[in-house]
Amino acid sequence: GNIWIGSYTGGVSVAILLKHPISILAHEKGNTHSLISNNVNDIEENPDGNQWFATDDGISIRNTLSGTWKHVLKEIVTISLCTSGNGNVWVGTYGDGVYLLDNNGRVLRHLTKQQGQLTTNYIFSVRQDMEGDLWIGGLDGCLIMFEKEKGSRRSFDVNWVQSIEPIDRNRVAVGTGKSF
């Protein structure tokens, strides 16, 4: 148990309980081996142990074994991260839809409103449920579910989605700007 604390302007703090003082990961101007931005919106750890940070200036990926950093989707406001069962990462953005990246940060897929796959490009939450279905929600658009088994897309009349959290095999909790 480490506790990872992302802040909007102060980078990322790491609390290693009862062992060490809090470590702070922060953007260092001109240093590519630091966060790309201190405006951190989400943090995700892959099965391989790499840490992904969604920021206002793209994604920073920290290799925990080597300590090296990689930056992808530069200059795109990234809001939400969700690691899929195979280690790929879904990324919700503010204005650019949803990306699927492989574990090295390469773009595998890009979903947008213009392509008809989403009802908004302003995505606040991307989550995968226990069945492997992908749930996507954001500003001024419907809640979308991509069914893994059927390969189909369903939309629900739930708008202004702020957060999505799988509860069990049959339920997903959705928090919106107006209700829960």
Annotated model-derived regions:
Residues 1-180:
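Carboxylate-rich, polar loop motifs that coordinate divalent cations or form catalytic acidic clusters
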